[in-house]
Structures are given as C-alpha cells and as structure tokens.
C-alpha cells in the first residue's frame, strides 16, 4: 500500500511540475524546457555546501605536524641523542613510504609469491627455515639502504631477520666512509609477507641500539637486552598506513596521507587500556600449548578472568597488525611456545624486543610468560622467545596462570 501511495503522490506532484501532459509522445516546448531545467538542477553542485566532515578534516590536517617536523621538534627538546636519531628516523619514514608503494602494487607488479633466481628456481629458505617471498627480498634491500644510507657516521651495522649474519654499512653501501657509527639497527623488513597473496595487512618492525664504547662492531654488539633499545617502532600497511614510534618516553603514531605523501602526527601519546576485549593467538596450535596458556585462553572465552571481560578472538597472522589492534583496543597478543617448539616462533631481537618496548611505553606489558621480555639476554641474533604483549592486567594474569598451573 505504501508503494502505491508513493507512486500516486509522484504522479500528482509530477503533473503539477510538468503540467497535465497529454497521452501523446509529443510535448509542448514550454513543458520540455521545464523538465530540462528541473532535471539539470539535480546534477548542479556549484551552490551545494561541502559536507562539514570534509571541510573539518581539511582544517584538522592543517594543524597536524608532519613526521619530519615532529622529529625536528623532538631533537630540539631532547638534545644530542635525539639529534642523532633524526636522520635515522627520517630514513625509516622514507623506507615505509617505499614499502607501502610496493605493497599497494604487489598484485599488479608481481611482488607476491616465493622469490626466485634468474633461472626461475625458488631461492633457498632463509636462516629462519622459511621460504623467502618476493616481498621479503625487495623490502630487505630497501631497509638496508635506508638505514645505512641515512647519514655517514651514525649507523655502523645492521642485522636483518632475513639474513644469516649482521652486515657492516660499509659493505651495504660499498663505501668505507659508512663503517663508523655509534648505533646499530635491527629489523624485520616485512612481517607477515605471506599475507600479501590474500591482500591482508603486513608490517615492518625496527629497533636501534647504541654500540658499546671502545669495542669493535660484530655480532656480539647486537646481543643487547631490549631495555637497552634507544628507539623502536613499526609500520603497518593496511586500510591506512601508520608508523608507530617510541624513543623511550611515550608512543606516537603517524598516518600516511597518500595524496601528499607525508606522514602526519595523528596519534599523540598512545596509551593501551589497562585491560581489553581482544585476544590474538593462533589457536590452530591450541592442543600443543602449555597447560597454563590453554587454561588462560579458556578463561578469556568465558570471561572468568579477574578482569571479568569475555574476550573476542582476532588473529590476522601478522605480528604488527595483531599487536596494533591490541594496542588500540586493549587485550593480549600471544605467540607461546609449544610442546615441540618451546621457544615459539618470534625472534627476540627483530620482533619481541621492539614490540615489547612499544607496549611498555604505551602503558602495557611484554612477557615471556615467566618474565619481562626486555630483561632477556640474547645468546644469538636469531634467538626466539615465547611472546605475550598487551594490556598490563591481561599480561599480568597470564603470568599468574604460568605460576599456578604446570603441565600435566
């Protein structure tokens, strides 16, 4: 009945607007002009005011600092140490932009799938025993060049999750002038690279340490605890591209404007809730988890933890994406050890330490289940540790489950 009434109303209003048209196909000139004027006005937006949200967003962007401007201000506020970081962090911003462009073109420019040599043969597995993806190889080169080429005399060596051993910047750049520097960098060039085939989020993780004074830079230089990190951060390539950074006094986020090609300071002093509704674990491995972890996950699902929150599972399969979700909404990310692999999957230097520093600086916690991640002394550059990151109440309770329960 409503449809019939609407049609009748349209017929009446139409007759009023166009005149009482005869049943013939021809119309008077005046009627045609009336209809032309009426319909053409529908597409005329010259006098239409822009939606307020669009206008407000332009005004807001004018007030936001660019990433480079933020670094200038911070280097002025913090002194010499921050001034050393400025060219390094600028280079990281450029690396993230380059990787973002490659990620966006991965499907059209054939950057997905396993990496192959000039003869079309799949490359050997990397040091982690994983098949190297095309994206791994390309992004690793970008990170090497950006870190080592940021400025002579700052970064002396780099260690990549994709390479067997650390590399001197003089070797990367082919110039001995790049052999001297007070800092070393560690990074995972593309976290979750297999996600690219399915157009799912991926990320980049990095950390910067100071060299030990008076000692030659070698592999031992990199074997520092996470609490000695000078700076750490990640880039998330997803619906938006965001760079999250800490220099040891809080966490800030910068969103890439694809039109202007700049990162803007959109997230100031990021803080994780003390507890939250998200848990992010690969539950395909549930039956191989230790008893404390299994009991904790069961408690999360029923809301029978001390927080009283009944949690929701969210798991993308990329550390950066899953941890960022937890950082924003609260909860816990976990990659525990299993019965067959007690150390788990995540690398201490390239993944757990940088992400752990960010979580702690945002008011959260980072644990192995039995202790603070940032207090772990690495024994080799590709060392792995069980990793739990997130809201302080959630992570603390997981640690309690490890204390109260033991494997049967």
Give the role of each language-model region.
Residues 6, 14, 35-38, 63:
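N-terminal leader/targeting signatures
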Residues 120-121:
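N-terminal alpha-helical transmembrane segments of multi-pass membrane transport
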Residues 115-116:
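Helix-loop segments that flank and shape redox-cofactor active sites
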Residues 1-26:
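N-terminal chloroplast transit peptides
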Residues 28-30:
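Eukaryotic, compositionally biased intrinsically disordered regions
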Residues 17, 25, 34-44:
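N-terminal mitochondrial targeting presequences
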Residues 42-110, 124, 131, 137-408:
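IMPase-like, lithium-sensitive Mg2+-dependent phosphomonoesterase catalytic core
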């Amino acid at each position: 009945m409503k449809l019939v009434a609407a049609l009748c109303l349209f017929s009446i209003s139409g007759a009023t607007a166009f005149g009482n048209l005869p049943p013939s196909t021809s119309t008077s000139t005046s009627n045609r002009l009336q209809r032309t004027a009426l319909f053409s006005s529908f597409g005329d937006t010259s006098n239409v005011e822009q939606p307020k949200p669009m206008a407000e967003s332009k005004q807001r962007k004018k007030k936001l600092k660019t990433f480079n401007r933020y670094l200038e201000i911070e280097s002025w506020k913090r002194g010499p140490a921050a001034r050393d970081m400025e060219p390094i962090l600028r280079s990281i911003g450029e690396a993230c932009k380059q990787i973002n462009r490659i990620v966006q073109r991965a499907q059209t420019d054939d950057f997905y799938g396993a990496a192959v040599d000039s003869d079309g043969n799949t490359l050997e597995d990397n040091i982690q025993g994983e098949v190297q993806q095309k994206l791994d190889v390309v992004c690793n080169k970008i990170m090497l060049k950006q870190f080592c080429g940021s400025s002579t005399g700052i970064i002396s060596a780099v260690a990549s999750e994709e390479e067997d051993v650390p590399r001197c910047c003089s070797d990367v750049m082919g110039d001995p002038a790049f052999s001297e520097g007070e800092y070393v960098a560690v990074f995972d060039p593309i976290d979750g690279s297999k996600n690219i085939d399915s157009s799912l989020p991926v990320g980049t993780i990095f950390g910067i340490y100071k060299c030990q004074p008076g000692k030659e830079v070698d592999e031992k230089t990199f074997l520092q605890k996470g609490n000695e990190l000078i700076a750490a951060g990640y880039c998330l390539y997803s619906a938006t591209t965001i760079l999250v950074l800490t220099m040891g006094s809080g966490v800030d986020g910068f969103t890439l404007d694809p039109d202007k090609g700049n990162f803007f300071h959109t997230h100031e002093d990021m803080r994780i809730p003390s507890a939250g509704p998200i848990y992010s674990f690969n539950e395909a491995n549930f039956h191989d988890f230790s008893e404390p972890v299994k009991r904790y996950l069961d408690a999360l699902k029923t809301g029978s933890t001390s927080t009283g929150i009944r949690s929701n599972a969210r798991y993308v399969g990329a550390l950066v994406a899953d941890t960022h979700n937890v950082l924003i909404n609260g909860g816990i990310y976990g990659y525990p050890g299993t019965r067959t692999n007690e150390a788990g999957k995540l690398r201490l230097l390239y993944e757990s330490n940088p992400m752990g520093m960010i979580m702690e600086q945002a008011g959260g916690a980072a644990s192995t289940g039995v202790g603070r991640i940032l207090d772990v002394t690495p024994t080799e550059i590709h060392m792995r540790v069980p990793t739990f990151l997130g809201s302080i109440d959630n992570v603390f309770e997981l640690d309690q489950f490890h204390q109260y329960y033991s494997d049967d």
